[in-house]
Amino acid sequence: MNSSLGILWQACPGGARILRVFGDSPCPALPVQIEGFPVVEIGPYCFAQNQRSQPADARFWSVDGRGPAAYPHPIAGDFVQGVTLPAGVRALHNAAFYNCRKLEWLCAGSALESVGSDLFTNCRALDRFILDAAPDAPTGLKKLVAAVSADIGAVFAPGGAVQAKVFYPEYFEFLDENTPAHIFNHSIEGEGYRYRQCFDGSVLRFAEYDAAFPQACVGESEKTLCRIALDRLCIPYALLPEAQGIYSAYLAAHAASAAAPLIARRDTESLQLVLKLA
């Protein structure tokens, strides 16, 4: 938790709901509890630049005990780059990160159960969710990736130790009108939707995720497929031999495409894996 952080909050069923965050850090780590109440919810438009009026029962609290005058700057909008939620957060309300265009990552625990609508609208820089949970634990990942149709990665890192990585490609949804009958046909383009269904309840099913790769090879780009294969091979959590062979064969056949982004970001560990397969 940041040592200099101001919080506008209200009581809610089970604990505290954070309504607004103030401070100077673009990557705040929110408090586990406020005045003895466990933090369990993030309120609507909490990190949005333009916020709605606050409820009458809203209260101010700060880590260092100073009042609201010491915290004039909201951590909101384009200022936000990453947010670490307390492990006990169960709900993210509507548009909590609305128009946070520079938000790159969100870290959440295993308690997340509910997410609102328009949660990440216009969060164009968002590229990963970090789960402070074991890869085989129930988490809110299914709901989080369902809220983002663009490319998005997920990292399981309980206690900060990375145990698994997966990548969810972009997908698109369309409604096509059959004009004479006034019937709308729902269609989906991209394998990202299929990947987002690979859960048993709220637990990621790695075998099902890996089984989607051959179909993804039909329509996804080399860049996307290399990312999927690399994430699974570099940290092969619950990776079955058959899937490992398929991923390895793909990277061996597309080594140049796989290596290019790794060289650009100087990811030597992943690059060595690709070179061994080539």
What are these regions (language model features)?
Residues 45, 51:
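Glycine-rich, acidic and aromatic/proline-enriched surface loops and short helix-turn segments
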